[in-house]
Amino acid sequence: MAGRSTKKTAKTSTNKKSTKLAVKRRAAKLTLLAGGNPQIAKADGDAAVQAYIAAMPGWKREIGRRLDALIVRTVPGARKAVKWNSPLYGVEGQGESKGWFLSFHCFTKYVKVAFFRGASLRPVPPAKSKSKDTRYLDIHEDDQLDEAQLAAWVKQASLLPGERM
């Protein structure tokens, strides 16, 4: 009996170690919220946005990289932050920020790009919002991204008064 008890204790000890290790690994991984949107701590700067993009699941990560590169190319020196688990892009004004002009967010089947003053863009981005000013562009996995049109919207949006958040 003593031998059995020792084997069982050794086995239980091994299981506890494995469980603790698995819990630590899960805690180290990023959490994906509803629709696969990464949960990233609120922070200012490029590092937070890059952490968000790196945590975007599957094909959405490449969309995030392309969006970030296009925004930076179109609006050099754009201000970046992550708030409410979404990257935000803004422009510095005279002495203070003019506000945020764009954000994006992962959903189950698409990445939603939000133009906070989208109703003022020409042409107006296709998807409406509950907010009269905001318009969206939903990017699905197999969509052909019209980068010229997107860059035009980004440029226009960066010149408008931004959202204060």
Segments predicted by a language model, with ranges:
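Charge-dense, helix-prone N-terminal extensions
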Residues: 2-165
